[in-house]
């Protein structure tokens, strides 16, 4: 077990954000239908997080060759540019992908594609993992509420905070 450093730098990852690093950094984010992908190398003690908002880049948005972690495909490319050693040495953890609409709101929504964005994000990310022959070491996906994620880059521990349901 690695002890928490005396000084911790707290980094809030915005939607569509990506961070890779090591040391005394704690990445935190807030998820609803978005999915957080976390890579961690337990021997080298570094990793990162992407806050994915959409399963793919819409065809109407032209890529200027810059990667954007807002989209699942781009997020994986950003990770693959950072990885050292074999991809299979990394622990991969997934969080989020909730359905953020209540039953009443779901009845009002005519655009099913908007309502199902959390599940579409989950499926897209899992397809990328399968395609790259990568395994998930842990996940907390789906459901009907937001999550706060805290990822400590000094030891790879991830804490998930969910609202209490009454």
UniProtKB/Swiss-Prot annotation:
GO biological process: chemotaxis
InterPro entries in the cross-refs: CheD-like_sf, Chemorcpt_Glu_NH3ase_CheD, Cytotoxic_necrot_fac-like_cat
Keywords: Chemotaxis, Hydrolase
EC category name: hydrolase
Family: Belongs to the CheD family.
Function: Probably deamidates glutamine residues to glutamate on methyl-accepting chemotaxis receptors (MCPs), playing an important role in chemotaxis.
Name recorded for this polypeptide: Probable chemoreceptor glutamine deamidase CheD 1
Gene from which the chain derives: cheD1
């Amino acid at each position: 077990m690695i002890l928490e450093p005396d000084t911790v730098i707290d980094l809030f990852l915005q939607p569509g954000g990506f961070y890779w690093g090591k040391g005394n950094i704690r990445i935190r984010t807030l998820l609803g239908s978005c999915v957080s992908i976390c890579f961690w190398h337990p021997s080298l003690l570094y990793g990162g997080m992407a806050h994915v908002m959409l399963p793919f880049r819409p065809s109407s948005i032209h890529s200027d060759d810059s990667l954007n972690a807002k989209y699942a495909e781009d997020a994986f490319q950003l990770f693959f540019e950072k990885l050292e050693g074999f991809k299979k040495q990394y622990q991969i953890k997934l969080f989020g992908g909730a359905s953020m609409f209540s039953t009443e709101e779901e009845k009002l929504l005519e655009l099913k594609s908007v309502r199902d964005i959390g599940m579409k994000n989950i499926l897209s990310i899992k397809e990328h993992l399968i395609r790259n022959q990568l395994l998930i070491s842990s996940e907390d996906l789906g459901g009907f509420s937001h999550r706060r994620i805290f990822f400590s880059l000094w030891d790879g521990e991830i804490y998930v905070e969910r609202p209490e349901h009454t």
